Structures are given as C-alpha cells and as structure tokens.
Design a protein with these regions (language model features):
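PP2C/PPM-type serine/threonine phosphatase catalytic domain
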Residues: 1-218
Length: 218
C-alpha cells in the first residue's frame, strides 16, 4: 500500500487558559509532504509543568523514532518509545523537582507501508473521517468513559460530570508506567482525513460538528 498525504494542517491555541499545555509534532512551519510521524500531546491540567510534559513527550518519542526505527513501527516498538519518554520524564524531574507530578496525554499517527498506525494514551482523540462520516475514533482513557462503559452514567451525563477531566492513563514516568492502545488502519481511501485533537477541542465540538467540518459543509 502506498499512502500519500495532502498538506497537513495544525492549530494550537491556549483558549481561555493562562498557558498553553498542548504540544504538536511536527510544527506547522516544519511539516513536509513526506512526513510520516504526527503527534498531539496535552499536558494534564493541574499537574506541575504540563506544557513541559507535552513538549518532552513529543521530543523524546520523535527522537526514539528517528534514532531506532528501521521499518514500520510495531506495537513493541511503540511501547519502547513510550517507555523512553517515561525515562526522559524521570531525568527531567530529577533535575527539576518542582515538576514532580507532570503528565501528558499522547495521540500519534504514523504513515506506514501497511496502513496508518495509531497510538493513544489519555483523553486526547484521533478520528478517521471519510465524506463526512466518522469511520473510527479512539476510546478515551478517562474516568467518565469508564463509568459510561459500566452503565453508571450516560454519555450525555459524562459531558457535564464534575470529574470529566480525570484521565486514567498518562505518560508520567517509570514510577507510573502506562501503555498505549495501538491499532493499524488498513482501509485508507483518497480524500480521507485523520484528525488528532485534545479534549479542549472536544469540549467545543461534538462528533456531528466535526464530521460536518471535514465534509466541507461549514
């Protein structure tokens, strides 16, 4: 399978927050049409130095890929990349003790020869869209999603639940190791879209609106 991409687009804003805890890779001014690795990370709100956590995750995982990847990434390779990021977190916190507790989500897409490899940790999300239809979306590693799956609350109640921002997986360091959910999308067609976003976007846009945007109806 040969997958070619159109011009990637990226937007990052702090919105109503005092600082922007999101990080993206590659930066918009650095992206090229032969780019294969894409990431969006969101420093966990309330944790110390969330913006450092998201940036460090992007930087360390990109470094691991560029240094060690010889072919398409396997799940084992991605797990090792996440572990490397956790080791980098440990090193940073050792030098900056005030950053203890920093954490970040991860969404990652890699354009491979066999399809598009997706990995995610936390409540940032990845969508695969075609002609205004959401074909696939990642499942949030969040407290409210767990409650929905258990039948304790409804999806509608999850939107306003007081603990809707609590996540149950994050990159934090080797003291709290985590694991990414990984999947390969093989059904890729011309004019498909991949959308990687943080929960800040999802607080403003429901799935129906996201589908409309990527169908060019807005």
């Amino acid at each position: 399978m040969i997958i070619t991409i159109g011009k990637p687009c990226a937007i990052t804003e702090k919105g109503g927050r005092s600082n922007n805890e999101d990080s993206i890779y590659p930066l918009p001014e650095q992206v090229t049409l032969d780019q294969k690795l894409f990431m969006v990370c969101d420093g966990v709100g309330g944790a110390e130095k969330g913006e450092v956590a998201s940036s460090l995750a992007c930087e360390s995982i990109q470094t691991f890929f560029s240094t060690f990847l010889k072919d398409d990434p396997t799940p084992e390779f991605i797990h090792k990349a996440v572990h490397y990021a956790e080791v980098c977190f440990d090193s940073y916190v050792q030098e900056h003790p005030e950053a203890m507790g920093m954490a970040t989500t991860l969404t990652m897409a890699y354009i491979a020869s066999s399809g598009i490899v997706l990995a995610h940790i936390g409540d940032s999300r990845i969508y695969h869209l075609r002609k205004g239809e959401i074909l696939y979306q990642t499942e949030d590693h969040s407290l409210v999603n767990s409650l929905v799956k258990l039948g304790k609350i409804t999806p509608e109640e999850a939107l306003t639940h007081p603990q809707r921002n609590v996540i149950i997986r994050a990159i934090q360091g080797t003291h709290t190791p985590t694991e990414a959910d990984i999947i390969t999308l093989n059904d890729i067609q011309p004019d498909d879209f991949l959308f990687l976003c943080t929960d800040g976007v999802l607080e403003r846009l429901k799935n129906e609106k996201i589908a409309e945007i990527f169908n060019g109806r807005l």
